[in-house]
Amino acid sequence: MMKTTHAIRWKAKDFALQGIDGRTYSLADIRGPKGTLVVFICNHRPYVKASINRIVTEANALREIGIGTIAIMPNDTESYPEDSFDNMKAFAARYGFSFPYVIDTSQEVARAYGAQCTPDFFGFNAKDELQYRGRLDAARMTAVPNAGRDLFEAMKQIAETGHGPQEQFPSMGCSIKWKD
């Protein structure tokens, strides 16, 4: 289990990553008119499995308010074949992803963003400035009543004002599986 912390308000880094649909995606391809959510996830780790339905639900709700979303899989697929490209396709189909799911084979994008765990959330305003570096909600491994909607509320605020909340709780998940 890892918690993330990160400086706020740096600019989103561009990328060119292959999606499970065969397309190559850049930041411009997924940017929403009100902001962008970049999520680092994988297919097999328990924190992602426990929260993926909520992540998909929130991404769908965010699209309605002008926030574009992309999910990036940064793990070493040679050491962790559960995160292979083919398994990414099956995972996205199983959970009904409505947003691009791409692979960061070189892990350069994950390093550039400072991603540390899966899931890990980076919320940017319309000017591509990082405004949210926090958790999905307070539920952790199991969905619980009254867990709140930290990510959704933060991104809604960003869509409305261009600025994220002052109080942010770090994301928690399994560490990214880096290549040696």
Predicted features, each with a name:
Residues 1-167, 175:
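Chalcogenol-based redox active-site neighborhoods
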Residues 170-180:
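A short, charged, Gly/Pro-tolerant segment at domain boundaries
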